[in-house]
């Protein structure tokens, strides 16, 4: 890529700067990503390899590593990565569309049971995508979650290198 997609001007290649991947709706930092900057029009691009694997790794990370109740942006990310509309997720979980909407916009906190169910659904989806019938990690993940969890106001950002989603998905859910 030598020319800007927007204006056709020469672009500057950036390889040593972390990329804040906020397009997914979460606070994710990708290291080792080639970025492009057009000084002429100000347009910025990033070259992110294998988005499907990246999103799967982020989803599995949320389900297995985040011990607090799911945050609104995490619920929305999981739903979108499941390729579900809010109406479809609501039907799957046995709640109303307005409940899913309130979870996703932060007006209502997701309950413990629905949090666990959404994580379970996502992990089974990730497992099916990896050609496994049942993901053994789901039960272990639920066992590791405390019965009562506190809300975390300021979570740490997730920092990832391409090797983590290109080569090293958890054994439970390789893509």
Predicted feature residues:
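Alpha-helical residues within the helix-turn-helix
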Residues: 80, 91
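Recognition helix of helix-turn-helix/homeodomain-like DNA-binding domains
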Residues: 94-110
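Short, basic-rich loop-to-helix N-cap that marks the start of a DNA-contacting helix
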Residues: 107-119
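N-terminal cysteine/histidine-rich coordination modules
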Residues: 1-63
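Short alpha-helical "recognition helix" segments of helix-turn-helix
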Residues: 87-90, 100
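Helix-turn-helix DNA-binding elements, focusing on the entry/boundary residues of the two helices
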Residues: 75, 86, 97
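A short, Lys/Arg-rich alpha-helix, primarily the initiator
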Residues: 59-79
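Long C-terminal interaction/binding lobes of large macromolecular proteins
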Residues: 120-175
